[in-house]
Amino acid sequence: MEQTWMITCKVEFRSSVMFELDYEDTVLNLLQALPTNQTNPAKFIINSLTIPLAVQNAFQNKDFWRDPTGSKGEFHLVIKVILDGLENNENDWADSITCHWLDQRSGFYVMVDSTFVGHKLSGEIMCTVDEKICECIEKFANIIPNKYNYYHHTNYRFHIQRYRVNISIG
């Protein structure tokens, strides 16, 4: 069943080595540090879609003269999600999660406060997903269901099509 979601993700980084952090490593670390949602895998996956985009925004907003140890970023996304074999009973949510990890390159800790807001839209809504956004999500798309499958012994798959994300079992 196809659903249209408006999702907002805000991230706030804190680390004494912000200038050393690598974008791709940071996204992967954040995706791995994010706790999985046992009762609603669709919600976990939908939230995870915006992480690469919000982190990218935070990296673009780095200003070491103002704040050498932190950066903030956010991204708003309207996306069509096809839930094949999954159900998402929630129409609205707001989650706030703090994650931290040890950066392997620098040996320093990174802490990230993440806030997710999701709202199910009805009717014919224009999506905000373009080719550039699809490429950014697709780069990290494998780790999202892999992490969930590993922890919960399931077999979800992820297919990113133009303007849509297909989440299926099997």
Swiss-Prot record:
It comes from the Viruses. Belongs to the tibrovirus protein U1 family. This is Protein U1. It comes from Tibrogargan virus (strain CS132). The gene is U1.
